[in-house]
UniProtKB/Swiss-Prot annotation:
Protein name in UniProt: ATP synthase subunit b
Organism encoding this protein: Magnetococcus marinus (strain ATCC BAA-1437 / JCM 17883 / MC-1)
Keyword Acetylation: no
Subcellular location per the Swiss-Prot or TrEMBL entry: Cell inner membrane
UniProt record similarity statement: Belongs to the ATPase B chain family.
Lineage: Bacteria, Pseudomonadati, Pseudomonadota, Alphaproteobacteria, Magnetococcales
Amino acid sequence: MISAAYAATHAAAEHAQSGMPQFDSSTFSSQMFWTVISFVALLLLLKKFVVPAISDVLEARASRIEEELKAAENERKEAAALLVDQRAEVKAEREKIAQLLESARKEADALREQEKAELEAELAKLKSQATQDIEQARRQAMSEVRGVVVEVALAVTEKLITKSIDKAEANKLADEAIRHLEANKDQLH
């Protein structure tokens, strides 16, 4: 039995030597020591070189993001101010255009009224002139008709009554005939 126990432990020792050294219990203490030393050295190296570099990068990135946010906020404020200014300018331009349109409309109305008044005055003048021309032509025609009527009346009267009528009597008869014609001129047409 002893030899069987010896053989089992010897086989386990051989197996441990031929296997992974991490599982060899005789080297646990030295492995733990060097693992702790390596870990502490790694932490010190990380703290000394890597963490400050990462911290600097993160701080730089944070400050850059903060600056970009401030710049974006400033640009937003400027854009809002520009928008307000643009809206005010657009409103002012619209009011100006409305005033120009109203002024142009009033000016066109005034010009139209002036042209209308001038045209009406010209038409009244032409009507008055035409009325005067017609009246003058009527007088002239009546004068010519009167002369012809007097002569015809004289000739007819002389032939009818074989009595001579003087010029004054003939004018009186002609005036009477003309008054009769003027009074009945609507019936003649």
